[in-house]
Amino acid sequence: MDIKRTILWVIFSMSLVLLYDNWQRANGHASMFFPSANTQQAAPAGAGGATPQADVPKANATNAAPGTVPAAPQAAAQPVGEKVTVTTDEVRAEIDTAGGILSRLELLNEHEKDGAPVVLLERDVNRTYLARSGLIGGDLPNHTTVFTVAPGARTLAPGQDKLDVVLTAEKNGVKFVKTYTFHKGSYVVDTRFDVTNTGTAAVSPTLYLELARDGSKVEKSQFYSTFTGPAIYTNADKYHKLTFEDIAKGKATVPAATDNGWVAMVQHYFASAWIPQTGKQHSFYAEQIDPNLYRVGIQQPLGQLAPGATVSTDARLFAGPQEERMLEQITPGLELVKDYGWLTILAKPLFWLLEKLHGFLGNWGWSIIGLTVLIKLVFFPLSAASYKSMGKMKDLQPRMTAIRERHKGDPQKMNQEMMALYRTEKVNPLGGCLPIVIQIPVFIALYWVLLSSVEMRGAPWLGWIHDLSVPDPFYILPIVMAVSMFVQTRLNPTPPDPVQAKVMMIMPLVFSFMFFFFPAGLVLYWVVNNILSIAQQWQINRMLGKGKTAAVAKS
């Protein structure tokens, strides 16, 4: 029984590692064990990138008007514009009139380790992440055209609920007006696009909305990773992730044209998304612009405009943290950027329960502890059944050893007598394994809840833990975890095989080393889980001991 239990825990541990590695590869990251031989070291995406006209998207075949030929790429100097800074209670945004693009966005209530606001959108020599829009279908105003900004307030004043920034450009007989509306207490920027034909011939413009980003990850860890890259959602195809690697190789597929959905750029804890007006037909695209610069976008045909005619359409731009409840209120499916993968069906209820505990306890650290206790209580009957089954197997160990010795030269006869013994004593040799296997998906789902939740970012617990999303600065929790794992191994009978005994002694050290680099919230969960497991094992052994004493007394 001890050998089987040791093997079970080794299999359980390796299953966790392999499942995690599979998750990594499914999210476009290199395997921990089989790194890709052709991994490219992409050059940084600078502020310049492609030539202005070359990086304007071409009209999709389904959007192009009859006889419309996309403008050929032309070498041109980078346009020079003015930077307009807009400040609300949630964001500080920078709009570049060269293209009318959102070129920088700081999240004022989300902070880095040094206390500076998180910068989500940005353009400099090392990083490119932009929200762009424009017109195609001829040489029309686009994100390389210099716009004129209308005068007006740039800071949301006390008592003010919204603030408008209006930009205008005219080119080749088409006037294009963008209006950005920033709201108090919101990460959503409403955008309005007014297109007027000021020329003498009909035009058929197509509006594009895109997010352009370099392929570099914002944060890197050798022991855990989350998805970074574009995503597309439609009511028909649901949530669809695109890896930068697939886009570069031309393997990325996008949903068919529709009148709903959105496009997004996703990274750990944060995301941005263009959400077009519902009910308006549009198509999707995902492309590589430069060796380390990609874009995902939407193209919406605006129809044929006669001279003097105007057409208007709306869209929304979200750029902020992946707060699940907030995302649910913005548009259908946007909460899926907080990616739990194939364990969503378990992870979402766990996060819901964690939120409820936080509403009661007011601290995410104590909420993690509370959730761990509740999970242990739910699985207590299964754990008791597991220990009971293993206890019976332990009692049968002398008889099983005798059978092995008696029939060591006849495996078939040995197995027959073993099965007869199991039937007589009503023991299932796998009875100790199944309860543990059932719990594995829940443990993994909770792991991803804690790793993915931006609510843990900057959330303190007590004393030295000021941020549950970063490693313990003094490594106290990993050390406590190592001690708790060591105690667990000592509570179990020593395996008869010396090699297995050494493995069981080394495992706490190996796991503890890994957890030195894990977020404190995750380590807190494992520490509490281990301590509860020790208490649970002691209680179950006590219950089994009382049962045996009572049985002996009756006999």
UniProtKB/Swiss-Prot annotation:
Residue numbers spanned by region Disordered: 40-81
InterPro entries, per database record: Membr_insert_YidC (IPR019998), Membr_insert_YidC_N (IPR028053), YidC/ALB3/OXA1/COX18 (IPR001708), YidC/Oxa/ALB_C (IPR028055), YidC_ALB_C (IPR047196), YidC_periplasmic_sf (IPR038221)
GO cellular component entries: plasma membrane
Topology of the protein relative to the lipid bilayer: Multi-pass membrane protein
UniProt biased composition (Low complexity): 40-54, 64-81
Transmembrane segments: 7-24, 334-354, 360-380, 430-450, 468-488, 503-523
Keywords: Cell inner membrane, Cell membrane, Chaperone, Membrane, Protein transport, Transmembrane, Transmembrane helix, Transport
Superkingdom of the organism of origin: Bacteria
One Gene Ontology MF term: membrane insertase activity
Any one GO biological process: protein transport
Keyword Transport in annotation: yes
Main location: membrane
Localization of this protein: Cell inner membrane
Family membership: Belongs to the OXA1/ALB3/YidC family. Type 1 subfamily.
Entry function: Required for the insertion and/or proper folding and/or complex formation of integral membrane proteins into the membrane. Involved in integration of membrane proteins that insert both dependently and independently of the Sec translocase complex, as well as at least some lipoproteins. Aids folding of multispanning membrane proteins.
Record's subunit section: Interacts with the Sec translocase complex via SecD. Specifically interacts with transmembrane segments of nascent integral membrane proteins during membrane integration.
Protein name, as recorded: Membrane protein insertase YidC
Name of the encoding gene: yidC
